[in-house]
Design a protein with these regions (language model features):
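Gram-negative bacterial Sec-dependent N-terminal signal peptides
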Residues: 1-29
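Flexible loop/hinge segments at secondary-structure junctions
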Residues: 30-434
Length: 434
């Protein structure tokens, strides 16, 4: 749903009172971890995404389980999108951790620290992003945070779903890779070309909804598209980028029948809850599940039922797929991301990047849903102060057996999966210095 526009007035007032109560309580303890960023993992992290800002995650969400296991004051989370989240962590001009996190279509410039009682906090405790640090992101951080350096660890994976609404369709839309390529390159423009009936609206044109903000969901989708969709006759191809308008720019898109929305929840709302049908787009699967949106299968696989391996529902990331102190430095002539060493990076193993090639195309031995994003938790090496222990534990929560066991919002059928990756709590502890 679109942030803050649904629900009755009484519930809205009660929610506001709850936020004020939580803010007063956290002010006394001054230990709630303040962060935000990616919308893709938000349901898994906090359990409820009715509002952009959630300072009371459900007990079975990742952050709720983290609070219970470590008996601390938990974490607040503001859904800004990956690009804005990285900028707020870096202290880019015009952003501030204290700035509000209001509902609506505008992308926030802060994580709402004032709202949750952390009025003296000068930098976020953490951020989340589904697009890994780029060279520009790293440079922005060094400029904004001085002696500190960013930390980055892969946390979870999400299935990127093709969400649609055709009220005359009676069966699940099953797309091939070629059809996914065609929809987002603009070569398939009608429902009839997909073998689907005319929507109730009477308009056969596919009305594509995309992410208008800097988005790790867009990065994940374009990573799949640039790896699996051949160039057209004119040599046009997809570009892996967190800005969807860049990803499809060679095709002269977005087009006049396409519309942009900020955040996964707003994309899903535009597709599912409009006054008419005929819309199609992409969003993290958990967001579509939350509002009972129609989710297409791709090559017969579901982004909820077939995400990760069939046994423990985790996405396997081998040690050879993780590189340290590298960042995305651009794209090659085929639109594939270039991973390069960071100039002036620390020698520690604190900036971990999963090679985009590792999840752009499934290995022949893997039978699962093919469009996947890897989401990261980010932090600061310096300036953590009395929050250091809580921040260490939060960044390591996706690898803590007790936290994982208590988390019910990530796993089988949820559209989100934990990772089997070579990251340890000891490693993270050594990265959060003070």
């Amino acid at each position: 749903m679109i942030f803050g526009t649904n629900g009755n007035n009484r519930m809205t007032k009660l929610a506001g009172a709850l936020v004020l109560t939580l803010a007063a309580a956290s002010s006394a303890h001054a230990a709630i971890q303040v962060g935000g960023g990616a919308t893709l993992p938000a349901l898994g992290y906090v359990g409820n995404v009715t509002h952009r800002l959630n300072s009371a995650p459900t007990s079975t969400s990742l952050f709720g389980a983290y609070k219970t296991v470590f008996a601390n004051n938990g974490a607040s989370y503001c859904q800004t999108g990956s690009g804005a989240g990285k900028n707020i962590l870096a202290g880019v001009s015009g952003t501030n951790v204290q700035n509000g996190c209001p509902d609506g279509s505008a992308t926030p410039t802060g994580f709402g620290a004032t709202t949750v009682g952390r009025t003296t906090l000068t930098q976020p405790n953490f951020a989340a992003s589904d697009s890994p640090l780029s060279s520009t992101d790293y440079s922005n951080y060094v400029t904004g945070r001085g002696a500190s350096r960013p930390l980055q660890f892969p946390a979870v994976a999400g299935g990127i779903a093709v969400v649609y609404r055709n009220d005359n369709s009676t069966t699940t839309l099953n797309l091939t890779t070629a059809q996914v390529c065609g929809i987002f390159s603009g070569t398939i423009t009608t429902w009839s070309a997909l073998g689907q009936p005319l929507p109730i609206s009477g308009n056969d044109t596919l009305q594509v909804v995309f992410r208008s903000d800097g988005s790790g969901t867009s990065f994940g989708l374009s990573n799949f598209l640039s790896a699996n969709c051949p160039a057209d006759g004119a040599g046009h191809h997809f570009i892996t980028d967190q800005a969807f308008s860049n990803a499809v720019s060679q095709y002269g898109l977005p087009g006049s029948t396409w519309s942009g929305q900020s955040g996964n929840a707003n994309v899903v709302n535009a597709i599912v809850n409009g006054t008419t049908d005929g819309f199609i787009g992409y969003a993290e699967a958990a967001n579509a599940l939350a509002v009972a949106g129609n989710i297409a299968t791709v090559n017969g696989k579901s982004p909820t039922a077939d995400l990760g391996d069939a046994t423990n529902h985790k996405l396997a990331i081998s040690s050879s797929d993780v590189v340290y102190n590298n960042a995305i430095s651009g794209v090659d002539s085929n639109g594939r991301p270039i991973v390069s060493p960071i100039s002036g990076a620390p020698t520690t193993s604190c900036i971990a990047l999963v090679k985009p090639d590792a999840y752009a195309t499934l290995a022949p031995s893997v039978s699962g849903y093919p469009i996947v994003a890897v989401s990261y938790l980010l932090g600061n090496s310096q300036g953590n102060g009395t929050d250091a222990t809580d921040t260490r534990n939060l960044l390591g929560a996706p690898y803590n057996a007790s936290v994982v066991a208590a988390t019910k919002t990530i796993g089988a059928g949820k559209g989100l999966a934990f990772l089997s990756a070579p990251i340890t709590q000891t490693q993270i502890n050594g990265c959060v210095i003070n």
